[in-house]
UniProtKB/Swiss-Prot annotation:
Residues 23-36 have a biased composition (Basic residues). Residues 1-22 have a biased composition (Basic and acidic residues). It comes from the Viruses. Residues 1-42 are annotated as: Disordered. This is Uncharacterized protein 1.1. InterPro entries: Phage_T7_Gp1.1. Keywords: Early protein.
Amino acid sequence: MRNFEKMTKRSNRNARDFEATKGRKLNKTKRDRSHKRSWEGQ
């Protein structure tokens, strides 16, 4: 998980592509808490 944070800080371009695939859940939780509830409840 630490490597993921480093990637986002180094290059935002790659971070966007990464969050679109593997990091989608991680970033979504940080951005909107309401969305976090939806998939955490399941």
